[in-house]
Amino acid sequence: STFINYFGGLGLALLYNAKCVKWKRVWRIFPMLAYAIPSFITLRAFNFMFCDAGPIVGLLKEWKWVDSNFTIISFDSKWSIRLLGFFCCAWISIPSIMFLSTGILSNANNDMYEAARLDGANGFQQFLYLTLPFVLFATTPIIISTFIANFNNFSIFYFLRPEETLVSGYFNANSADLLINWMYRLTVDKKLYALGSALSLILFAFMAIFSLIVYVSSPAYKK
């Protein structure tokens, strides 16, 4: 999810900054609207559109593109609800990365791109050796915070799945729960406070160590 959000936002920023794109201000309105709407409203809207009684599943069944048992959000759905969660997370997060990358790219030195073109570098090589290192240098802390936020993204599956169901094979959880959702169930629903606290400490230790290693190893810290 972090990879999709980051490079999706960076790709949109590069697209909007391209000289061949016209009406740039008009196209920027659409991600701005996705960013401005509160996330829980967006998630409830996606829940309505993709539930069994929603318009998207209904149209797919009406057009005979899927069978009558097809479902995306239900108590036994697994990969469909996970893919929908990835899509919703990207819908909510990509605009913020796009705005951040747009501001960073506006400070890029055009002389280095001109020199690269004179040396025969194509567009992909310019992106790989000039744009990407330049943006990564400034956004490494943002990547770390986005990675941690995805671990704690409680609202994605809490608002997407309409009912609180437990699936066999999972301990007080279902197939779409993140760790934060699972800890919520353990503490609030099942009153297993000791287990929830232990899992919270383990998750915190993992994220703290990972973030420290990545940040210390990044060029942003070394320079």
Residue ranges and their predicted role:
Residues 1-223:
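A structural signal for multi-pass alpha-helical bundles of membrane permease subunits
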